[in-house]
């Protein structure tokens, strides 16, 4: 009984391999089918994916502002061995005073 089931599975696998080789060997018909497949993937997978991502961003933006964590002056963070070459030398290039603390703490506190 196990041998019969094994031969059925092998027959199905062999048949699917034959169908796959036929699809891969088709020349001119493959280009039209490929274009149709990519068009369908664009409309039914990519565009709904973009829509779901937009909805996620919209819902997250209306969720509310989170409180920032309390500043803890760890000795291994925000080490300044020499000043930055711009501004006052203490702010990074893309410094945000509401999010990025200086070595002494947040600026707007």
Curated annotation (Swiss-Prot):
Mitochondrial matrix compartment residues: 25-34
Q: Which CDD domains does the entry mention?
A: Cyt_c_Oxidase_VIa
> What Gene Ontology molecular-function terms does this entry list?
enzyme regulator activity; oxidoreductase activity
Q: Where in the cell is it found?
A: Mitochondrion inner membrane
Which Pfam families does the UniProt record give? COX6A (PF02046)
GO (cellular component) term, any one: respiratory chain complex IV
- Pathway listed: Energy metabolism; oxidative phosphorylation
- Provide Mitochondrial intermembrane-side residue ranges: 60-109
Give GO terms for biological process.
Answer: mitochondrial electron transport, cytochrome c to oxygen
What the entry lists under InterPro entries is as follows: Cyt_c_oxidase_su6a (IPR001349), Cyt_c_oxidase_su6a_CS (IPR018507), Cyt_c_oxidase_su6a_sf (IPR036418)
Sorted alphabetically, the keyword list is:
Membrane, Mitochondrion, Mitochondrion inner membrane, Oxidoreductase, Transit peptide, Transmembrane, Transmembrane helix
Report the transmembrane regions from the record.
Answer: 35-59
Q: Which domain of life is it from?
A: Eukaryota
Q: Keyword Mitochondrion, does the record have it?
A: yes
What does the record say about its membrane topology?
A: Single-pass membrane protein
The record describes its quaternary structure and partners as: Component of the cytochrome c oxidase (complex IV, CIV), a multisubunit enzyme composed of 14 subunits. The complex is composed of a catalytic core of 3 subunits MT-CO1, MT-CO2 and MT-CO3, encoded in the mitochondrial DNA, and 11 supernumerary subunits COX4I1 (or COX4I2), COX5A, COX5B, COX6A2 (or COX6A1), COX6B1 (or COX6B2), COX6C, COX7A1 (or COX7A2), COX7B, COX7C, COX8B and NDUFA4, which are encoded in the nuclear genome.
Record-linked PANTHER family: CYTOCHROME C OXIDASE POLYPEPTIDE VIA (PTHR11504), CYTOCHROME C OXIDASE SUBUNIT 6A1, MITOCHONDRIAL (PTHR11504:SF4)
Summarize the protein's role. Answer: Component of the cytochrome c oxidase, the last enzyme in the mitochondrial electron transport chain which drives oxidative phosphorylation. The respiratory chain contains 3 multisubunit complexes succinate dehydrogenase (complex II, CII), ubiquinol-cytochrome c oxidoreductase (cytochrome b-c1 complex, complex III, CIII) and cytochrome c oxidase (complex IV, CIV), that cooperate to transfer electrons derived from NADH and succinate to molecular oxygen, creating an electrochemical gradient over the inner membrane that drives transmembrane transport and the ATP synthase.
The protein here is known as: Cytochrome c oxidase subunit 6A1, mitochondrial
